[in-house]
Amino acid sequence: MIALPVIPIVLIAREYRLSNWMIVGFTLLYALYPATSGGAMYDMHENCFLTFFLLMTIWAAEKKKTYIMILMMLFAFFVKEDAAIYVLVLGTFYLLSRKDKKRGLILMVCAAVYFLIAISVVNSYGLGIMDNRFSNLYFDADGGLSQVFKSIIANPGYVIAQMITNSSADSVEKIAYFILMFGPMATVIFTTGKKYTRYILLSPLIIINIFTTYVYMHDITSSIILELLH
C-alpha cells in the first residue's frame, strides 16, 4: 500500500501533461521521501492505506469524475475517522481557489457530516477520540477539542509557541521533523506565486502534527506521519 500511491501520482501528473522526466521525478520524490518509508518501519498501521485513497480522491476531482471522487473519499473515511480533516481541507482548497466550487462543497459537506457522526459513534460506543494528544492547548485538565479551537482563536501567540515546543526540554524532535519533512522539497512549496490558497493544503500538517507536543505526532518513524503524504 505504500508503493500504490505512485499510481495516482502518475495519473495526476499526466492530467497536467507533465513530461515523462517530471513524472519520474515526482514518483521518485514520493518514493524517497523520508516519511514514506519511515512511517512504515514501526508497525503495520491503517495509515498506510490513507495516502492512496486521498490521492485518488484528488485525481478524480481533477478529472471531474464526481462519483469516483465520492467513492475514493468514502474509502478514505473507512480508514480512520480523522481522514475527514484532510478531505475537508481539500474541499476548502477547491472552493476558495475557485478551482471547482461544486466538488469543493461536496467534499466539505461530506467530510463535516462524517466527522460529526464518527466522533459521536466513537464517544458513545468506543473509548472516545484521542483529543488528549492536544492537551497542551487545553485551558484545564478536562478540556477537549472545543478548548483547542478556543485556544487557537483566543490565544494565537501561545499556539504559535507550541509549534516550536518539544515534548521535553532537552529534545529537538520538532527541528528534526521540520528538516525531514520540508528539506527534501527544498523551496518548492513556497513557489506558488500569488496562488495563496495552495497554502491551505499545509494546514493538516500544522494543526495535527505541529500544534501538539505529543512526540509521535512529529516523529518521522511513526506511522502517524503517513497521513500527511497526500
Regions found by a protein language model. Name each.
Residues 67-96:
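Transmembrane helices and adjacent periplasmic/lumenal helix-loop junctions
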Residues 86-113:
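Perimembrane helix-loop-helix junctions
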Residues 85, 199-230:
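Hydrophobic/aromatic-rich transmembrane helices and adjacent perimembrane loops
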Residues 127-168:
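Luminal/periplasmic active-site loops of membrane-embedded glycosylation enzymes
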Residues 162, 174-199, 203-206:
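Hydrophobic, aromatic-rich transmembrane alpha-helices
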Residues 39-47:
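Short acidic/glycine- and proline-prone juxtamembrane loop motifs at membrane-interface regions
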Residues 3-32, 51-52, 68:
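Transmembrane-helix signature of polytopic, membrane-embedded enzymes
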Residues 17, 46-49, 55-68, 95-98:
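Membrane-interface transmembrane helices that cradle and orient dolichyl/undecaprenyl
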